[in-house]
Amino acid sequence: ATIINDAPIVIDPKLTGNKLWEPKNYDGRFDGPMTMRRALERSKNLVSVRIMQAITPQYAQQFIQKFGFMPDKHPAVLPIALGAGSVTPWQMMSAYAVFANGGYRVQPYLIERVTDVNGRTLMRATNRIAGDEAIRVLSDRNAYTMYSLLHGVAVRGTAARATRILKRQDIAGKTGTSNDAHDAWFCGFAGNLVAATWMGYDTPKPLGARETGGGLSLPIWIEFMQDALKGQPEYTRIMPSSVVEVNGEIFYREPIDGAPLPVENTPQAAQPQPMKDLIRDQIF
């Protein structure tokens, strides 16, 4: 529920590693103070840059290694907030699996097993199950918070088409478009099935002035999921006891700086606490 300002910003060349940087939002608008959740749903670039300023690019570069990203591919400069690094769909799929499975890093694989002509198994992939042999890289409450934020994107934000077409309420994900539309992304999951789609050229060049991840990659993801999810019931995700949801926002249960916690399920007759009083700075 942290409030962050969606307003113009100019970044010094020393902080970009290159030249003076004046990032923009895709829609060209600045909508002022908003919650982190709302900013993610609207793909507000300026909010992402301010978050990166708060946590520092150096911390981000170190933290993303937990998800399998290589530090040498992600320079510790502010533009890392908007995808200045280099990633593959394979890496993105592996990273999003952490949010989908509750905080564990699992290793994807392409070939499950190899058999000979007689059906004898010659090789079988080692499958580390989340919560069993896999390493926890994110707390359950932070994984759930990320799910909640990404779920909002698929319900109210730039990926709302996925929920509408698939007619499921367990979808979470994020669209992405790089500078000059060189890359169009959608990464997400439905239940425990994770998929990442990317559209671009082998030799980077613009896909088109108006092309976006929501317009190019999201439809591919939806079409794949239409087949992959056939016969699969919706997944019910359990909220950890360490967080509480109030007015659609997720809060840690322990008090911060002695402030009282928000109250769950406020009765209709009671006066709700103003949202501005519920704001806590949460960096995770």
Sequence positions of predicted segments:
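Conserved catalytic neighborhood of penicillin-recognizing serine enzymes
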Residues: 1-60, 105, 117-145, 150-152
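Extracytoplasmic/periplasmic beta-strand context in beta-sandwich domains
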Residues: 2, 7, 78-80, 109-112
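Flexible glycine/proline-rich, aromatic-decorated loop/lid segments
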Residues: 13-18, 67, 112, 189-191
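Active-site-adjacent bridging/hinge elements
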Residues: 15, 62-74, 121, 165, ...
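Mid-domain, small-residue-enriched loop/turn segments at the edges of structured enzyme/sensor domains
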Residues: 18-25, 56-94, 110
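A penicillin-recognizing enzyme superfamily signal
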Residues: 38-42, 86-250, 260
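Low-complexity, Gly/Ser/Thr/Pro-rich intrinsically disordered linker/tail segments
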Residues: 244-284
